[in-house]
A protein has these predicted regions:
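C-terminal catalytic "cap/lid" subdomain
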Residues: 1-113
């Protein structure tokens, strides 16, 4: 684990490339996905819920767009079209991210795995 913290300031790269629609349907979720796609990286999204649900049931694996308020409306279509591998985890659950990073099965939603 690095001893320093890196902060990405995406304004200039986004302004120069202008890759995303100018709409309130694009928020930090899709911006993070754009960064991951641009760098050919997988993306871990930490939210305050366990993942994306449909009819109250957690979706473990997602391969098609669904309506959700967990991520912005542009996020799922973007990551599917760009083939970004994503996992959505509950960042409020202690050790959830660490367990996932260690390869243990955890509650969450994966897209593209």
């Amino acid at each position: 684990v690095p001893e320093t913290l890196e902060v990405l300031l995406p304004y200039l790269p986004l302004r120069n490339a202008d890759p995303l629609p100018h709409t309130w349907e694009v928020t930090s979720d899709t911006i993070a996905a754009w960064v991951a796609a641009s760098l050919s990286l997988d993306l871990v999204v930490l939210k305050s819920v366990d993942g994306i649900r449909s009819g109250g049931v957690l979706i473990n694996r997602l391969s098609q767009p669904v309506e959700t308020e967990v991520v912005d409306p542009s996020f799922i279509p973007f990551v599917i079209s760009k083939k970004v591998r994503v996992v959505i985890l509950n960042g409020r659950v202690p050790d959830r991210l660490e367990s996932w990073l260690q390869g243990h099965p955890v509650t969450g939603t994966t897209i593209g795995f």
